[in-house]
């Protein structure tokens, strides 16, 4: 373990606490940020690959390139706060899996709003002795350049190691063809095959599956009812989820850690690999050469010690998210700073940076399961007597071909009804939640999540048993429009002293969002009545957190008005790559992470083909 006080585990190591957890912590102790004159043994300011951001996309690049022999450094503005598994999902604790509504507070605590208009409310009841402002306050992240009528008010970011994957839903559907960007021009079959190949690999990294909730009573109640109601019209299935069921009562949700464990290398498990993670480090500038054809350095600042240095690498990869990738590029001379002015000529470097941005519309409601559905749970049971009385019994006939439910279902119900005779519901307390979807299709061009999960909104009050609740979230697409922009101030900085992001966005008109709302209302009524306070509603713009198109992908920079090619390489620069949802140039309604990961895998294939890893000086002893 490093003796440097800048090591996040420094204070911890000085204590007398020597539990297994403490001993385990030493295995991934982090080196201090390397600077000239104080390099720890084996460290340098030069790497093969420098990655900005530690979410699933950054971890995809890290995994692919580290395993290919490259010496990789990863820089993350946030810190490690997800326990001993670096960048792991915070829902992987028994506490939150027993009470999902408690996890809402975790999400709310992690999210940081991107752009908040200045609060113009005046406090006119202050004491005359108190200092009073003559203009509006601009602290607490307020952005005086943000027009509240053109804001993505719900848009937020998560600044921790692992990014949003430390609290996401883990929904990883593939994009249907109408949502997908092209990777192969003029050959539909080849494009389909390429996407299938990339999706399969991405799904293996995330451990995506569709059977983790196959033995959930609530899941099957909702799924079977909707399949029955929409037979021959719509297809329903489990949401594709990046998760692994460990037991009937515990699911391990995937995250950045699942893709790549973020442990420094070499280590005993990977003695021939090279990787270092540097948390609490802000990347402030990517340095261009005089010819504007290559990146020659990455300026970073240690947020603890305040030291700034320049990192050298052969390849530079930005995976800090749709907002922060564009923010770093704008601060580095790409695109332009300041409010966009149509009268000015387009900038020479990445003229379409931050244009054509997209975000999904979101409608939401919650329903309480119908009496019909709850009564159907015990359809195969023979119930004698009253609960709490000596003669009370619940039985069924295993293997009876006339049973409406499988034996696993009936056994769970019988056991619960006998063990918990005080409970008016026949559904076991630890029955997994529903996770149902009807996927995007041309006739219904929206994505659906019919489930029970924690978001920054939608918690259930204590007076309602959450086993009865079903959440309905329908996500609509937005056509990319050049006038919908994300731009960065030339005057104001954010809390991290980086250029303040500002949105100039409005959802395009049309009937699609209203049709989606109608579809949700009709469908949800088949499951039950609305939960008071959670009636069907449109949610704040940006609350979906699926911002896309900030640095669009295409085949030709001018013709497609984009920033990167289909290998995610920035146009005009041979060694600068961008990863994440900001690359996706299409109107999409589904969760975009799996698609962004697939693009990162393709990008890694290009890097491995066009760059060589440096010789590995580490000596290995057998």
Curated annotation (Swiss-Prot):
Originating organism: Trametes hirsuta
Active-site residues per Swiss-Prot or TrEMBL entry: 546 (proton acceptor), 591
Alphabetically ordered keywords of this record: FAD, Flavoprotein, Oxidoreductase, Periplasm, Signal
Cofactor(s) needed: FAD
Record has Protein biosynthesis as a keyword: no
Enzyme class at the top of the EC tree: oxidoreductase
GO terms for MF: flavin adenine dinucleotide binding; pyranose oxidase activity
GO cellular component, one term: periplasmic space
Top-level division of the source organism's lineage: Eukaryota
Compartmental location: Periplasm
In-chain residues carrying the UniProt-annotated modification Tele-8alpha-FAD histidine: 167
Family designation: Belongs to the GMC oxidoreductase family.
Protein name, UniProt field: Pyranose 2-oxidase
Signal sequence range: 1-28
Activity vs pH: Optimum pH is 6. Active and stable from pH 3 to 9.
PANTHER family on file: PYRANOSE 2-OXIDASE
Binding-site residues, substrate: 449, 451
Propeptide: 29-37
The keyword Signal belongs to this UniProt entry's keyword annotation: yes
Subunit structure: Homotetramer.
EC number: 1.1.3.10
Function recorded in the entry: Catalyzes the oxidation of various aldopyranoses and disaccharides on carbon-2 to the corresponding 2-keto sugars concomitant with the reduction of O(2) to H(2)O(2). Plays an important role in lignin degradation of wood rot fungi by supplying the essential cosubstrate H(2)O(2) for the ligninolytic peroxidases, lignin peroxidase and manganese-dependent peroxidase. The preferred substrate is D-glucose which is converted to 2-dehydro-D-glucose, an intermediate of a secondary metabolic pathway leading to the antibiotic cortalcerone.
Cofactor-binding details, from the entry: Binds 1 FAD covalently per subunit.
Temperature-related properties: Optimum temperature is 30-50 degrees Celsius. Active and thermostable for 30 minutes up to 55 degrees Celsius.
Catalytic activity: D-glucose + O2 = 2-dehydro-D-glucose + H2O2
């Amino acid at each position: 373990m490093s003796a440097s006080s800048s090591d996040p585990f420094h204070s911890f190591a000085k204590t007398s606490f020597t539990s297994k957890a403490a001993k385990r912590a030493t295995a991934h102790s982090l080196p201090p940020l390397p600077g000239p004159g104080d390099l720890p043994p084996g460290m340098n300011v030069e790497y093969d690959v420098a990655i900005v951001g530690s979410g699933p996309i950054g971890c995809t690049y890290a995994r692919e390139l580290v395993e290919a022999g490259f010496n990789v450094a990863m820089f993350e503005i946030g810190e490690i706060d997800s326990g001993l598994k670096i960048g792991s999902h915070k829902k992987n604790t028994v506490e939150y899996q027993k009470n999902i509504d408690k996890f809402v507070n975790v999400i709310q605590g992690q999210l940081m709003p991107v752009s908040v208009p200045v609060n113009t409310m005046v406090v006119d009841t202050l004491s005359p002795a108190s200092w009073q402002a003559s203009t509006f306050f601009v602290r607490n992240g307020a952005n005086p350049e943000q027009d509240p009528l053109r804001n993505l008010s719900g848009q937020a970011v998560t600044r921790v190691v692992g990014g949003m994957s430390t609290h996401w839903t883990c929904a990883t559907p593939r994009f249907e063809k109408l949502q997908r960007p092209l990777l192969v021009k003029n050959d539909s079959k080849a494009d389909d095959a390429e996407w299938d190949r990339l999706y399969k690999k991405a799904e293996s990294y995330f451990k995506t599956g569709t059977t983790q909730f196959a033995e959930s009573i609530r899941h099957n109640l909702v799924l079977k009812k909707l399949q029955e109601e929409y037979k021959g019209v719509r297809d329903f299935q489990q949401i594709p989820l990046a998760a692994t069921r460990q037991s009937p009562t515990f699911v391990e949700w995937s995250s950045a850690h699942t893709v790549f464990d973020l442990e420094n290398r070499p280590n005993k498990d990977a003695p021939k690999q090279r990787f270092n993670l540097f948390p609490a480090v802000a990347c402030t500038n990517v340095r261009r050469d005089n010819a504007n054809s290559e990146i020659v350095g990455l300026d970073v600042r240690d947020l603890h010690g305040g030291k700034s240095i320049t990192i050298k690498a052969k390849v530079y990869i930005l995976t800090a998210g749709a907002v922060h990738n564009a923010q770093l590029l704008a601060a580095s001379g790409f695109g332009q700073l300041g409010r966009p002015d149509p009268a000015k000529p387009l900038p020479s470097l990445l003229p379409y940076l931050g244009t054509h941005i997209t975000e999904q519309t979101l409608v939401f409601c919650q329903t309480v399961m119908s009496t019909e559905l709850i009564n159907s749970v015990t359809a195969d049971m023979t119930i004698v007597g009253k609960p709490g009385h000596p003669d009370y019994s619940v039985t069924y006939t295993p293997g009876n071909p006339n049973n409406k439910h499988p034996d696993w279902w009936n056994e769970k119900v019988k056991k619960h009804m006998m063990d918990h005779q005080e409970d008016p519901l026949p559904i076991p307390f630890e029955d997994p939640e529903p996770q149902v979807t009807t996927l995007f299709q041309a006739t219904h061009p929206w994505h659906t999540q019919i489930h029970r999960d924690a978001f920054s909104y939608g918690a259930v009050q204590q007076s309602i048993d959450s086993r009865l609740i079903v959440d309905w979230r329908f996500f609509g697409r937005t056509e990319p429009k050049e006038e919908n922009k994300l731009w960065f101030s030339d005057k104001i900085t954010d809390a991290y002293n980086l250029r303040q992001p500002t949105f100039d966005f409005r959802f395009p008109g049309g009937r699609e969002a209203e049709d989606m709302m109608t579809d949700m209302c009709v469908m949800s009524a088949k499951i039950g009545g609305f939960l008071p306070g959670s009636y069907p509603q449109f949610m704040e713009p940006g609350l979906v957190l699926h911002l896309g198109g900030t640095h669009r992908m295409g085949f030709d920079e001018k013709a497609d008005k984009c920033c990167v090619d289909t290998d995610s390489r920035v146009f005009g620069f041979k060694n600068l790559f961008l990863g994440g949802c900001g690359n996706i140039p299409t109107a999409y309604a589904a969760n975009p992470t799996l698609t962004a990961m697939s693009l990162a895998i393709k990008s890694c294939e290009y890097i491995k083909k066009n760059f060589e890893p440096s010789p590995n000086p580490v000596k290995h002893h057998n």
